[in-house]
């Protein structure tokens, strides 16, 4: 069985920080090389953890850099941190993405009436174990929320680590409310309010905030997988400048047999401003 490991460059909380993923010691693209499905039956999926639960740094798979390492997002040259919206601290779940998926910005979804956000499909992993940036988790899908983020469709797949003690008991979205009461309501609230401390309006949801079931989520995943297949084949009407370099997909135009990345470093995190620890109290937020 293949083993995925991470290689870190630079210090966390700096502009230089990058987390590459390697498979059996060989660099791979976090976006393109890791299979979406972890088993032949397509019931278990590979999720890449970008942001561990309860942390603030807005880490994401880079669309621009070769092999798509995980980096910290920036705005106007400054590192982005998610604020603490009471009673939450940082991200409410292990947050990440499904590889080999793409929310196509050239396509308007018929039900949300909004185009894709040009990113891999987002995943909220709701198990009890806190992950780490660059971790490849095996998860099963339970449902999906449709966030409308600044006019774009931004799907949020709800999933659980297959190794979680509850994994055998939760198989669809209604099981989440049964075994984890309040989690879906809190997830909806968090995504609705988390940008307010930065001066932005609250986010909106399609379907009146309803979390759709596993069947609907599987269809969203299939659509985003097909969009990625068009992208990696070089056939997208507009690839938005995404780096498509990969080291495993030999039949694609951007395959490279060998790719070099810098030597790994194990540097201590740079200090961050104490204001990141502040709690923000949002009027109208439910607890």
Swiss-Prot record:
Its cofactor is Mg(2+). Diphosphate binds at residue 80. Its EC number is 3.6.1.1. SUPFAM superfamilies: Inorganic pyrophosphatase. Keywords: Cytoplasm, Hydrolase, Magnesium, Metal-binding. Its main location: cytoplasm. One of its GO terms (molecular function) is inorganic diphosphate phosphatase activity. One of its GO terms (biological process) is phosphate-containing compound metabolic process. Pfam families: Pyrophosphatase. Mg(2+) 1 binds at residues 117, 122, 154. Mg(2+) 2 binds at residue 122. Signal peptide: none annotated. InterPro entries: Pyrophosphatase (IPR008162), Pyrophosphatase_sf (IPR036649). The keyword Metal-binding applies. It comes from the Eukaryota. GO terms for cellular component: cytoplasm. It is found in: Cytoplasm. CDD domains: pyrophosphatase. PROSITE patterns: PPASE (PS00387). It catalyses: diphosphate + H2O = 2 phosphate + H(+). Belongs to the PPase family. This is Inorganic pyrophosphatase. It comes from Yarrowia lipolytica (strain CLIB 122 / E 150).
């Amino acid at each position: 069985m293949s083993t995925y490991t991470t290689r870190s460059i630079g210090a966390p909380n700096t502009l230089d920080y990058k987390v590459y993923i390697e498979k059996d010691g060989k660099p791979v693209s976090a976006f393109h090389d890791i299979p979406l499905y972890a088993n032949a039956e397509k019931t278990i999926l590979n999720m890449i953890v970008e942001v561990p639960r309860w942390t603030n740094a807005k880490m994401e798979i880079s669309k621009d850099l070769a092999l798509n390492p995980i980096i910290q997002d920036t705005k106007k040259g400054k590192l982005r941190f998610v604020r603490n919206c009471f009673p939450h601290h940082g991200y409410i779940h292990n947050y990440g993405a499904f590889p080999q998926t793409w929310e196509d910005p050239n396509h308007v979804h018929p039900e949300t009436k909004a185009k894709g956000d040009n990113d891999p499909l987002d995943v909220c992993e709701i198990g009890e174990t806190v992950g780490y940036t660059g971790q490849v988790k095996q998860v099963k899908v339970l449902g999906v929320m449709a966030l409308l983020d600044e006019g774009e469709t931004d799907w949020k797949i709800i999933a659980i680590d297959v190794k979680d003690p509850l994994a055998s008991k939760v198989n669809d979205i209604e099981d989440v409310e049964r075994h984890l009461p309040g989690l879906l309501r809190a997830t909806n609230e968090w995504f609705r309010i988390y940008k307010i401390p930065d001066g932005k309006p609250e986010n909106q949801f399609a379907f009146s905030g309803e979390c759709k079931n596993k069947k609907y989520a599987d269809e969203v995943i299939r659509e985003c997988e097909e969009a990625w297949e068009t992208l990696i084949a070089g056939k997208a009407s507009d690839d938005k400048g995404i780096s498509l370099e990969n080291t495993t997909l030999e039949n694609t135009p951007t395959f490279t047999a060998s790719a070099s990345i810098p030597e790994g470093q194990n540097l201590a995190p740079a200090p961050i401003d104490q204001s990141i620890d502040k709690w923000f109290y949002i009027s109208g937020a439910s607890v």
